[in-house]
Amino acid sequence: MTIDLNCDLGESFGVWSMGNDAAMIDLATSVNIACGFHAGDADTMKKTVDLAKARGVSIGAHPGYRDLHGFGRRPVVGLSSSELENLVAYQIGALQAIATMAGHKVTHVKAHGALSNIACDDDMTARAIASAIKAVDPDLVFVVLANSRLVAAGEALGLSMVHEVFADRAYEDDGSLVSRRKPGAVLHDADAIAQRVVKMIQSGEVVSITGKTIKMRMDTVCIHGDTPGAVEIARALRKALKDNGIAVAPFKTAK
């Protein structure tokens, strides 16, 4: 049994620092790098790509809405399908250019924050993200929230997909993530999170915030780099996976 561990990194901006990227990148097998719209800048992107290359970690673009003040967690309404496609393609291309400079390669794309949340329920947004990925590079892997509209969008365009579950987020009964505005949406107990994820992987099921069991395919588990205690959570999870005979490897080998 094998699983990929992914983390959202490169989310600092200028002199403002977010998370402990150097520590998290040692614990992840793939990382998603902010591309300057919700967070990140050219220098931060380059630094993060350099770290990933040095550690042999796969990198992906993490495009979001243009919303630095809100960290990409606020919806941007009224965008057309073509505007959404351009927004996503622009950010993928930015990271590809930085990666080329660093001698590394972008392997996947995972939407961020409100862009991802909306796409999980809205076919037009989901299709726009998938279309942008295919137009830029059809070999890029599409990281999708398991059981969401993103899955159908990726399938329709023949994209390779990796189904994602979250270590540090609670789930609603319909398989969607509990809104960050609600109590209990973000989990913080490292040991409890680690044991929860082990059970998820072993059973292929997620338990919702009300106790409902939901079947999900899971190829990769996300730990948010900006979650307080993220490093401790990642370390506890790596240990729990090892103790339970679950190998950790980049998603291209995940089953």
Curated annotation (Swiss-Prot):
GO terms for biological process: carbohydrate metabolic process. The keyword Hydrolase applies. InterPro entries: Glyco_hydro/deAcase_b/a-brl (IPR011330), LamB/YcsF/PxpA-like (IPR005501). Disulfide bonds: none annotated. Its EC number is 3.5.2.9. It comes from the Bacteria. Gene3D superfamilies: Glycoside hydrolase/deacetylase. It is an enzyme of class 3 (hydrolase). It catalyses: 5-oxo-L-proline + ATP + 2 H2O = L-glutamate + ADP + phosphate + H(+). Keywords: ATP-binding, Hydrolase, Nucleotide-binding. GO terms for molecular function: 5-oxoprolinase (ATP-hydrolyzing) activity; ATP binding. Belongs to the LamB/PxpA family. NCBIfam families: PRK05406.1-3, PRK05406.1-5. Catalyzes the cleavage of 5-oxoproline to form L-glutamate coupled to the hydrolysis of ATP to ADP and inorganic phosphate. Forms a complex composed of PxpA, PxpB and PxpC. This is 5-oxoprolinase subunit A.
